[in-house]
Each structure stands twice: as structure tokens, then as C-alpha cells.
Amino acid sequence: MTDFCIIGKPIAMIDAAEKTTGSGRYTDDLSLPGMLVGKILHSPYPHARIKNIDGSRAERLDGVVAVVVGKDAPNPYGILPVGHDEHALALDKVRYVGDNVACVVAVTEAIAEKALELIDVNYEILPAYFDPEESMKAQADLIHDNKPNNVEKDYHHVFGDPKKGFADADEIDERRFIANEVTHAAMEPHSTLASFEIDPQTGNAGRLTVWSSTQVPYYLQHKLSLVLEMPMSQIRVIKPLVGGGFGGKSEVIPLEIIAAIAARKAQAPVKITYTREEVFWAHRGRPRTIIDLKTGVKHDGRITAVKARVVQDGGAYCSYGVVTILYSGALLGALYDIPNIQFDGYRVLTNKPACGAMRGHGTVNVRFAFESQLDELAAKIGMDPAEIRRRNLLQPPCITVNGLRVQSYGLPECIEKTVERSGWKERKGKLAKGRGLGIACSHYVSGAANSIIRSDMPHSTVNVKIDRDGGVVIYTGASEIGQGSDTMTAQIAAEVLGCSLRRVKVIAADTDLTPIDIGSYSSRVTFMAGNATLRAAEEVKKLIAAAAAKKMGCEVDELVFRDDVVMRSSGVIAEGLSGQNRPGRDGRERPSPHGTFSPQQAQQASVSGHVEGQILRGSLQQKRKEEGPKDSMTFEEAVVAAIDFHGALTGTGSYAPPPEARGGKHKGAGVGPSPAYSYSAQVAEVSVDEDTGEVTVHKVWAAHDCGRALNPVSVEGQIIGSVWMGMGQALTEEMVWKDGLLMNPGMLEYRSPSAIESPEVEAIIVESVDPEGPFGAKECSEGSLAATIPAIANAIYDAVGVRLREAPFTPERVLTALRAKKNGKALNLTEGVDPTSPVRFREHGGALCYKGKGPERHALDRSRCGTSSVPGGAD
């Protein structure tokens, strides 16, 4: 069925009103009686051993209720089962400037901040490692004693025969690419409110409730249980409105556990909200990545082999690191047909904040390198960049060389649409000097086929309940974080049930009320929670259909649910009036199964609250019993009949990816497989000022294969948002470090593009209709981002003839490349570029809550190792 009532229609988000009017409540808006404020003391050193912590002076300050330190919750945790290397508050060591040392709980924020100054910490300063390739050489003073050479994890995969593939190649290109660290820059800072039920007789802490701006309520509940040594059933996690996540809230952040520990110790509700600067220090963004890439092609453009060595600067803790490094290798496949791949990946520890998941998790940096190199190879063999991509398309359904199953594949159409809309054939290489076009492609998963927590449980479960008045309530654990997942689930349920969207209410992400969903990340919600919603709605629809069929004296398969009416698909109402409305036996207009409601019908079939539906229901039902079976019923009437026959109207649906979508058996095979993949192609038009090095993006044509667009306006918004975020990483965004200090910990210095700098984006929806997606839908919110960066890089080459292999493409880097071209020498990636030199960076490293000033805050070299014993931790 493709004649949808709600699916495929542009629909406003169901939570739009509360967000646009300011009536919506985010975590930091919440307050409880007797609530206290928590503030965190951070490490001033990148690497040091904690010899002693004394919070007694802080505890004596009026207004201070508690001081919390690492020994108050010594159990380690981590988002991955293989990476339990974090403590909410440091126990024996601090591993980066900004690491969490202690927390003060006080009646006001001002008192808490004053108390931080009174905590005495003695440190033994240790050598620190800031560059991942240098860190890999470490033999002593390791960041974690159980990680030799500071390597968190390394993987080595060979698929096919890469040696033969390179031997067969007519042209080979081998380059180093660097993509620097970036962060999410979500509007809402991380915030958590924790409250224990305190037994008034014993004073013991009982049940815990946590409100948090999280993408993963179930994982948060799980980790709180682990650290606090409490049963999960005694922990309730509620997700209020979330002001953006992009991956930055997709794991358990120390703040969330610290708030719970503090609430238990203070025996009162405690709220902790990061300052914007703290968000930057705790960001878990995209890691700096060094990619040594080698690709071989034939003269006909066919790729023969790819070899990638990827080194990621993971920071001080595991975070999502194992998954991140595996994605960077696994998703080299599933975009093009590559017969031979060698991948060597290293996730390396450094004395900087941990990096984690960010929009396009694991794929963006390697895709920048690959799509840039593919253009270089096209130039070597004299082939159009669009054509070389066409020559390497997959032939679905297929299994890639590394075991990824591909069923729906809209990349060919994406390429054709962008080439056509941009005038590629007519304009490429023919624009005015300093202006150019570039093309690139990308793809992404529609959720991971294998769960982080290894189990056989469904990845998503949804419950649907229908009340007597026809109101539909959806209970889902999926987190709405601004991407529109609540609207999506409401649309699917309304489409299946044939009811109006205004009947549907969504209750989401409350672990006491909603069934398990493993979270909003990896673009999994539409595919997985959407399928679960569809199945739950179909289950309850069967109950309604059985009752309606009995009332109408027909078979269940004769019924059609549409426009708030349950009707027979054949019979009196279809005779001679197809496509028209006609009177029923009671004199009212009835819709044809092929028609729509008139305004009069819409009023008659409206939701509860109308006099006829509420006050006169009994007499109307009695009248209809006397008249005999009808050809149609309002949705509300059918629901009442079903409740009379069956009792409560509830349905449950679950989804887990099928076994055939879960990948191969090699080490690390669990990361990369997905039930479906999205595909994108982009053409960017840019201009380059050769005097200043400034790059301006004028327009981006972005085509995205999303399976089926359940809500086109939402899909277009996601495509535009992905392009915008990709442009930021391409041109301006970069976490700048100097000896372990973050030089730009604020929105002004970090420089995300503003609305003024955002280019025109022509979003092009391509619908391949996936056989397993809900109504054919799949991912739409992340896959486009990875194509933007190389499309801009390739456009810069078309404009001024220089290849930029380090992102972002700042004016300094552009000018350095132009000088290298003018002087006829190869570009050194770091020559002439000091990322800390622009005046926008804070030489003092910001105003994070830690002790010590200037260069004495931490060891800048090994010769300055020693012991700090002054209150607050500075010599």
C-alpha cells in the first residue's frame, strides 16, 4: 500500500509548540523541594597521581552540605563492557586537565564554588602524552597501567587479497590525511537532577530517581546500578526535553553519576549542570584522526584495493573508542564495491579528555580521506570524479567483502540527482578563477545490528494502549533529542490504525513506564523503534478489526482503517460511487474507501469531547443495534466495541535485527553490520580568496537515500543540519590544544558556523524503500555529514588547484597550500600553521574550576615532574 494518509506527508513536530513557545522543560529547568546544587573540582594537571584529598575546610563552610570524592563510589564503569576504566571522581590518578576530582554540594551555587577553593589536593605530577603517535611509544608512566604503549585497542583486518589488488592496479595513490578533533556544540549543556527517597526512620537512602539530558536512559540506569550497587528496579531514569545531543549525550557522563552519589551522601535532591566551558572539557566528541591511505585503481576506474592505517587520539578513557576505531575500518565497505581491503586501526590514549561518538560516528574522518583520494585518482587516470564513483557501485542485494549485507541502495540515483541539479557536466572546471565544484559520497548505518550490551533481548520494544474515547498512547523508551522520533512513532501508529495524528500521545524515555529501548544513537530509532511501533500498532489493530468485523457482519480482511473510520472495502458504500461520499443507512455521509472525509464527516468523526461521542453514545449504540450491521464505524465506535469484546486494548511490538544482518565472525565483526544503510551524494560550490585564504561555500546539492521519507520536512531538515555540521568541521571547527590545555573552550572561540555563514542547501530526497524498514524507511540524520567535508575539499581543488589533506581548511592552511603550490614543493601538513596563534584563543586555557595559575598548573615537560603539596594542588 502506497496511498498513505500520514506517512510521507510533511508534518510539524508534535512537540513543536512547547519548544517554540518556551513552555517545554529541560533538565536545568526542573526543581525539587530542598534541592541543592553541586559543583565539581577539576584537575589542573594532565597526568598526576593523587596523594591526598582533604575536604574538611570546605565541609566547615556555612551552606555546604557534603563533599564527595572518589572513594564515595569506587566502582569503575564505561559505556562499553570492554572499557570499564572510568570513575565518576578520580581515585588514584587524574589523566587530563579537567578530570573530575571532587564535588561540593551546597545550598547555593556561589557557596559551592567558594567551597571548591577550600579543598586541598596533593598531586605527584607525572609525564603527560598529547600526541597519539608519540604516546604509542610510551614504555613507562602509562596512562592506564593495563594498556601497554598507551594503546587502548588495535585491530588488523584483511579482506580479499590486498597485495594482489595493488599489483593489479594501474594507478596507486598513497597519502596521509589528518582530521582534527571537533565537538558537538549542542545548545543545551549537560544537566542532571538526582533524588533519593529517604527513609524518615532509618535515614537510609531508598529508591533513586534521576532526570538527565541523556540519549540513553536505559544505559544510564544500568551504569548507575553498577556504580551505586543498587538493583536496576530501584532506579528510575527520566529524560526531559533534550536540547540536542549529536552523540555527546549517548554515553553515561561522569556528571550523571556524580549527581547521584552527591544526592545519596547529602540525603537531598542535587542538581549539577555543566557550564559551557565544562561541556567542552567533557565533550566526548570526534577524535583527532591520522589516516595513512593507499588506494589502487585500474584505468577503467575500478578500485582494486584499499589499505588504511588509522590512528585515533582517544583521550584518557575508553569511551566508545573500540566502536569508533572499528567503524572507521568497517564502513570503508558498503559504499562502493571494493574487493580487497586491509585495515590497521589504533585507538590511542592521550592525556586529554576522552573522545566518543559524534554525528556520523567513526566514519566521517576516513570518508574525508577516501573521497579526497578518489578524486586524486580520477585526475591521474583522466576520469571525471562523478564517473569514477559510478564505476564502483555495488550491485544489491549483496554482501560486501567484509560481510556487510546491503539490500536497498539509492547511491546511483543520489549521484545522478546531484550531478543534474548542480549542472556538473556543464560547469565543472569551467567556473571563474577561484570558484569550483566538488563531489563526494557517503553512507551510514540504520542502527547497529549488534547491541553494546551483549544479550538476545530486542533492541526496541513499544507498547500501545487505546482508551475508550479512541485516544492512542504510545510507550517507548526511545529518546527524543530533537530529531523528531516522537513524531515518527506517532505517525507510524496513526497510519497503521487509520486514525488522526491528534489522537496519538507519546510517552517516552521513562524507565518506570516505558519498555526498554537501547537509546538514540547510530541513527537506529526510526528503523528499530519504528518497526517496534508498527508491530505494536498492528497487534492492537487486530483486536479492533475483530470486533468491528463482528459488528458489521463481515470478514476481518474486508476492513479498511482510514481517516478515523473503519469501513468495509466492498459492499454498499462502494457501489457506483467510487471516490465519492454517499449517505449511509442512518442518513449520514460515509466515505468511499477511496475517498476522503468532507468537513461534515470530519466533525462527526472527531475525537472525544463532542456531545454525540460522550453523552449520547449509549442511545446511539442502542439505535444501531436495532438497525442491524453497518458498512462503517467511526474509529471511536470500533474501539468501544473492541474494549467491550476484549477488555483493555493494548499491543506490544519488538524489534531485533535479523541474524543475517549481524555480520561476520572475525574479531571486531560486531561493529559495522546494520539492517540497512543510507546513501548520500553531494556537490559543493565554493570560492577561495587567494589573498586571505578564506573559503566560502555558496551552495550544496545534497541527495540522501532514506528508504522512504516518513516525514519529508523532517528529512530535509536532517539533511540540511548534517551539511551545516559537516561544513563547520570542514572550515572552522577544531578543538585546539597546547600542552594539554584547551585553547578555545567556548562558543565564541570554537566558531561553529552561524546562520549568516550557512550556504544554500538543496536537499534532495531519494527513496529506495528498504524491504525491512518501517514502511521502507531507514537512516536520514547522520549519513550526509561525511560527504560534505570531502565535497568542499574537492571543490577547493577545482577552484585554486590545491589539495588540502588536513581539516579544517582554515585560511592559514589554505594559504600554506597556495604557497607550497607556488614554490613547487609538496605540502607539509603542519608547515607554517600554528593553530594556537589566532587571537580568538585563550592563552590561559579558560576559567575551569581548578587551582593553580599559568605555567605551574601542570608539567609541560618531563623535567618538571615532581610533587605538589600546596592546598588546591599548585606548588
Regions found by a protein language model. Give the residues of each.
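Extended active-site and interfacial segments that coordinate phosphate-rich ligands
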Residues: 14-18, 117-130, 215-217, 222, ...
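C-terminal catalytic domains of large/alpha subunits in multi-subunit enzymes
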Residues: 70-71, 229-234, 263-270, 299, ...
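Glycine-rich loop/linker segments at domain edges
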Residues: 9, 15-18, 149-192, 288-372, ...
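Helix-loop-helix junctions that connect adjacent transmembrane helices in secondary transporters/permeases
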Residues: 141-228, 392-471, 743-757, 762-764
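Thiamine diphosphate
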Residues: 232, 245-267, 271-273, 485-492
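Catalytic phosphate/nucleotide-handling subdomain of diverse soluble enzymes
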Residues: 448, 453-514
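Intrinsic disorder/low-complexity segments
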Residues: 200-205, 567-629, 662, 827-875
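Flexible, low-hydrophobicity surface segments
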Residues: 1-151, 172, 255
